[in-house]
Amino acid sequence: MSSHDISWHSPASVYFSSDLDVKRIAGKLRGCWTDLLLRQESCCERVLQKSSSSMDYFLFRLFCSLALASLLVQRADSNEILGLKIPFDPILNANTVCLTLPGLTKKQLDVCMRNPDVTASAIQGIQIAIHECQHQFRGHRWNCSSLETRNKIPYESVVFSRGFRESAFAYAIAAAGVVHAVSNACAMGKLKACGCDEKRRGDEEALRIKLNRLQLEAINRGKGMVHGVMEHFPAEALGPQDSWEWGGCSPNVEYGERFSKDFLDSRETYRDIHSRMRLHNNRVGRQVVVDHMRRKCKCHGTSGSCQLKTCWQVTPEFRTVGSLLKERLNVATLIKAHNRNTGQVENAHHTHRRRANINDLVYFEKSPDFCERDLGSDSAGTQGRICNKTSQGMDNCESLCCGRGHNILQQTRSERCNCKFHWCCYVVCEECRITEWVSVCK
């Protein structure tokens, strides 16, 4: 029997009443065979949308689902059909990552060639950082929009070549994004060079033996049947009398921090004030992730008890990282070059002002107002930006429009609406067009 027969007729014939049903449906889906091999349902979806009746819709969807399930079961054999070699995961090597990634310095290219998979995770971390930057600065005159680079290194953006407060934030959050992404990728087993944090892993076999012993003791004391109860709770809930042991898989934040330093700090080849500012802010960003790692625990034991606690570390939510760095930006310190070439920086304020702390963001160039378009200072201007005339924040029309005033315009946009869940298991939505009045900066 051919693979074609196995994939299409065997699963379907169990559910359809006659060969006529199978032939009719297979005829409509004939052009979808390659799509199904690639585990793509787009072709099936196109046929479903053209279904003439609810019964056809149900039969077509069931047929597609069965065919996909059959292909997954026979994955090893089905990959050979049509001569297709389909990898389970994308292949990450030096050619597919490093040589296709513009903007890398020579040192960064060397780091990438040694660890292309880690570099790919680092780039994902930078993208996450850019999106978080856009969230933190939404409604501000400068809103991180120039940093969006579609999975490329964003350091060619003008803001990275300046010494603004915004530059300090951009460097710090990018470094934090690399630590965050690489550390978690290690724990998820995605990278060859690292795994779980071995310092916080614990002896799994010893924990299993200990739990078995505790359960047997509970049985002997007549405390009921043996059945593990697992509940997650914050480490802060643990009282001083509670004991716990390392278990599970903690993100390898030590490796993530080290790779972030190797990959990003290697861009700096000089010891001028600009390089020192960038190195300092890179370190601040990394440290925010490290300092806000938190413990998460799981309770093991017989029903209603917690005879053994195992804990592991988790990285902070990246929204938390962004908010913490934004708070530090609000008290960032203006610096000037030190007379001695020691690589240190000092604040440019008078002696009675607060000196720069090691955990402060620092900058050396006062920011422009970002009101008018000026590519030399990474300012896109605010003309055409939507403002909120009732807001008390940075997005209020008076502030965002720089006193130029605003127009009231009618805007029409589309969004999904009236979504309904169908058993089983898909959601169908309508597309609604919404017309609203918005305030737009002149």
UniProtKB/Swiss-Prot annotation:
Palmitoleoylation is required for efficient binding to frizzled receptors. Depalmitoleoylation leads to Wnt signaling pathway inhibition. It holds the Pfam family wnt. The keyword Transmembrane does not apply. It is found in: Secreted, Extracellular space, Extracellular matrix; Secreted. Its main location: secreted. A lipid is attached at residue 303 (O-palmitoleoyl serine). Glycans are attached at residues 143, 388. Coiled coil: none annotated. Changing residue 248 to S: Strongly decreases the ability to induce the expression of genes involved in tooth development. One of its GO terms (biological process) is neuron differentiation. Wnt10a overexpression in embryos results in loss of anterior neural identity, causing a phenotype with small or no eyes. Belongs to the Wnt family. Ligand for members of the frizzled family of seven transmembrane receptors. Required for normal tooth development. Regulates the expression of genes involved in tooth development. PANTHER family: PROTEIN WNT-10A, WNT RELATED. This is Protein Wnt-10a. It comes from Danio rerio (Zebrafish).
